[in-house]
């Protein structure tokens, strides 16, 4: 099947389910056969019960959305971020240890507003980081029956600045190695769920890892 996809952003702001369904109806009418749901960290799961209900969806709600899309014969693809673009997660004290920064405005490049002072990048050198995201992504994906999952991995401009990551650099790894390692971790996670991994390609311009990646990443 040739994928003709449109994406709706549910990660940066919460939309009403009625609006999402109308968006899906219009997408189908306009000839799209695939809906990419950009979720980031916007679903309340077993590992994220602390998420603000006013700003996130329950598993029941995301299942209703996925079921509606798939019930129309369309493909629903969940899209995540588990490296950068996770500032909404890191604002919670329960997830503070997953960040590279305690205060990005002091320790990083100073891009972050007060609300997101821990920044947008997680520490992939912290073993709890991928443990958390593996559980989160796996639970959310359980309500999607298509073969694809989008792992994001874009715009990782500010990483490997914390003590854990700097220790890896001092030991001989490069930032390219750290990025490649996270891509491959996500690839194995997708495989474990029986899904094909999608990702954004912008950071191949900075870290030339394309030739080293499995050919079935899209």
Regions found by a protein language model. Give the residues of each.
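Aromatic-lined carbohydrate-binding surfaces of glycoside hydrolases
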Residues: 5-218
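N-terminal amphipathic alpha-helix/helix-capping segment at the start of soluble metabolic enzymes
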Residues: 1-2
């Amino acid at each position: 099947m040739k994928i003709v996809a449109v994406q709706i952003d549910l990660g940066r702001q919460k939309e009403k389910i009625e609006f999402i369904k109308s968006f899906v109806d219009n997408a189908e009418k306009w000839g799209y056969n695939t809906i990419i749901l950009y979720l980031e960290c916007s679903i309340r799961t077993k590992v994220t019960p602390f998420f603000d209900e006013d700003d996130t969806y329950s598993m029941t709600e995301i299942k209703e959305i996925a079921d509606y899309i798939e019930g129309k014969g369309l493909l629903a693809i969940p899209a995540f971020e588990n490296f950068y673009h996770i500032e909404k997660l890191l604002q919670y004290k329960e997830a503070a240890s997953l960040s590279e920064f305690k205060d990005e405005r002091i320790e990083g490049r100073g891009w972050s507003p007060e609300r997101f002072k821990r920044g947008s990048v997680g520490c992939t050198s912290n073993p709890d980081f991928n443990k958390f995201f593996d559980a989160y992504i796996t639970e959310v994906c359980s309500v999607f029956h298509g073969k694809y999952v989008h792992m994001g991995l874009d715009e990782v401009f500010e990483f490997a600045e914390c003590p854990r990551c700097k220790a890896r650099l001092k030991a001989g790894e490069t930032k390219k190695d750290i990025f490649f390692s996270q891509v491959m971790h996500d690839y194995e996670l997708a495989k474990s769920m029986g899904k094909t991994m999608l990702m954004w390609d912008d950071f191949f311009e900075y870290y030339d890892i394309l030739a080293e990646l499995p050919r079935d990443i899209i």
